[in-house]
Amino acid sequence: MHSRCFAGYDPGDERTNNCLRGTRMTSDKPNRWLENRSVSGDAYDATYERRAAAGEDVHGEADFVERFAPTSVLDAGCGTGRVGRELARRGLDVVGVDLDEAMLKTAREKAPDVDWRLADLATVDLERSFDAIVMAGNVMIFLTPGSEAAVVANVARHLEPGGVLIAGFQITPGQLTIERYDEIARLADLDLAERWSTWDRDSWDASNDYAVSVHRKAAGSPDA
């Protein structure tokens, strides 16, 4: 079985779920990552290493992103850089941004040539733009509550005209609905291009509890 939250995702594996409590993005309010992170970066990556050793595909997100043939990618809420590292290994120009310094330490140790930034997605200004931005690992639903629109607007500002924002997250009652996410994206001048229920492009319908959404920036939109 391939990815939902990630390649090899098993919703019954509490150890794995503990690895996916979120990505902290702002410092003015409590957030789920700060409250719930229970593993180190090395332990987080070890989960995927065990799955890869067992023959599972743990690069579903990278495969999905690469399908759009970008040359540059922002790994937004990168954590240990698992997705960004794989994309960089495939020859893409990658920048990773996260607020978890411990997770970024692992990213820097494993891929020192990649540009890893300790920053808030809601306010960061990278002074450049990207062909694709990926937010994997449930980033959207583990942001500080109330910051979702600011994060999407700010990362969208870093997209090249015609570029894509790719986000995969669990649809959880009381958190972020797919309708609300689409509205946030629309307000950031992004149009829905594709939606799937897994990173392996299984078909989507409203009964699904996980979505991988692709929103595209209009070709005539201004750069970052």
Residue ranges and their predicted role:
Residues 122-132:
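A short acidic, Gly/Pro-enriched loop at the edge of an enzyme's catalytic core
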